[in-house]
UniProtKB/Swiss-Prot annotation:
The PX domain binds phosphatidylinositol 3-phosphate which is necessary for peripheral membrane localization to the perivacuolar punctate structures. It is a peripheral membrane protein. It comes from Saccharomyces cerevisiae (strain ATCC 204508 / S288c) (Baker's yeast). It comes from the Eukaryota. Gene3D superfamilies: Arfaptin homology (AH) domain/BAR domain (1.20.1270.60), Phox-like domain (3.30.1520.10). Belongs to the sorting nexin family. This is Sorting nexin-4. One of its GO terms (molecular function) is phosphatidylinositol-3-phosphate binding. Residues 1-21 have a biased composition (Basic and acidic residues). It holds the Pfam family PX. CDD domains: BAR_Atg24p.
Length: 423
């Protein structure tokens, strides 16, 4: 192997190491926009919202027979399509943190508010967050179903095939139910620290979320007050026009400043409501997705620990039989004796059965150990990727929050400097 080949392998190994998550081989730019109300199936009174998904990538396979690889791929999908994509990824990549989708928002469906601009625009942003997170994952972004979702013009036929292939994993559901009230006896300290940090982050994000909901509500109230003030100033201007033109001109200039303040506050509030708070809520859900993977890891660990306990009990029972103590209680032995059962033959038969069970359990325990250790390593790798994405998202979100506030204050300062100069 050449030095270059060795260096490539070494570099790839380092990318997969802890603390240095592997990056996807291609970049994606995905925008979800233009929500449109569509009619449902013939004979159905219900409708749905269709979203335009625009994709640009340097992965040339996405442009097969589609012309210029610099062009933008545009498809239209509905929420249920993205839900199917999410479920397929969850089913096919059990060791990955699958980015969450926004909630179904049952209240809006009941209230008939799911076609409002506020609801659909906020959902657009959240769906875009979901697809962007998938595109940043080195495995999910290279999946065939993700490519089909983003490029296929015949999605309906693919959708039916995908729905048929989506079978619930009954074993995992059963394991999750059986282990719901069990805990890992020997938890990795690293996972204990991860849990503590994620819980703290979740509490902090939840507090910020609640705080900015109050900010939005207060800003809406202030904007409404400024609008009313502007209307009153307009009426006052009309009253003095013709009698005191100088005062009317100054009222007009002052009203323009108030109007700019009202519009600026509305724009800032819209950003907070439609994007920043949505990002906070999506981050809360993303943290929960990470927790779900850790729970699944714990189930594998619990399976191993229970097998280990079962094997230990079987070995102990066999040793007791060999030493003459017996594996049954006194009354059971007496009943066997009265029934004419040969105690020594019965003891040897039990020992033979236990030896077979111990051999079988030893093999199962080794496999369970491999599964648990392998899942733990994959889980740690996924958490590294989660941390990388989460850090970048928070940094970008805070930067955007600062930029919008700076833009707001610069806009207001410019408007009121003009007012001050004119007055």
């Amino acid at each position: 192997m050449t030095d270059k080949g060795k260096n490539d392998l070494t570099s790839k190994a380092k990318d997969k190491a802890r603390g240095n998550p592997e990056k996807p081989p291609y970049w994606f730019e995905i925008i979800v926009s233009d929500p449109q109300k569509r009619t449902g199936d013939p004979g159905s009174s219900s409708g749905y919202v269709s979203y335009q998904i625009s994709t640009k990538t340097n992965n040339t396979s996405f442009y097969d027979n589609r012309g210029d690889p610099e062009s933008i791929i545009v498809v239209h999908r509905r929420y249920s399509d993205l839900l199917l994509l999410h479920d397929i990824l969850l089913n096919r990549f059990p060791t990955c943190i699958i980015p969450p989708l926004p909630d179904k928002k049952v209240f809006q469906y009941i209230a008939g508010d799911r076609f409002s601009q506020r609801f659909t625009q906020k959902r657009c942003h959240s769906l875009q967050n979901f697809l962007r997170r998938v595109s940043l994952h080195p495995d999910l972004s290279q999946s065939k179903v993700f490519k089909t979702f983003l490029v296929s013009k015949d999605w309906e036929s693919h959708r039916k095939v995908l729905q048929d292939s989506l079978q619930p994993n009954k074993d995992e559901v059963t394991d999750a139910f059986m282990n719901a009230f069990k805990t890992v006896h020997k938890q990795n300290e690293e996972f204990t620290e991860i849990r503590e940090k994620s819980d703290k982050l979740d509490r902090t994000v939840t507090k910020i979320d609640k705080l900015f909901h109050k900010v939005v509500k207060k800003n809406d109230s202030m904007s409404e007050d400024y609008t009313k003030l502007g209307s009153n100033l307009q009426e006052l201007q009309e009253l003095v026009t013709g009698e005191n033109e100088e005062l009317a001109a100054k009222l007009k200039i002052f009203n323009e400043g108030v109007t700019q303040l009202s519009y600026g506050l509305q724009d800032l509030t819209k950003y907070l409501d439609y994007e920043y708070i949505v990002d906070l809520k999506d981050l809360e859900h993303y943290i929960d997705s990470m927790r779900q993977l850790i729970k699944l890891k714990d189930q594998k660990q619990i399976d191993y620990e229970e097998l280990s306990d079962y094997l230990t009990r079987s070995i102990k029972e066999k040793n007791n039989l060999i030493s003459g103590y017996g594996g049954s209680n006194f009354f059971a032995n007496k009943l066997e004796e009265l029934a004419g059962i040969n105690q020594e033959a019965s003891r040897r038969e039990k020992i033979n059965k236990l030896e077979g069970k111990i051999t079988s359990l030893t093999g199962e325990l080794e496999n369970a150990k491999k599964v648990a250790d392998g899942f733990e390593q994959e889980c740690l790798k996924e958490i590294d990727h989660f941390e990388s994405v989460k850090t970048a998202e928070i940094k970008k979100s805070l930067g955007s929050l600062a930029d919008h506030h700076i833009e707001f204050y610069e806009r207001i300062l410019e408007a009121w400097e003009k007012v001050d100069d004119s007055l």
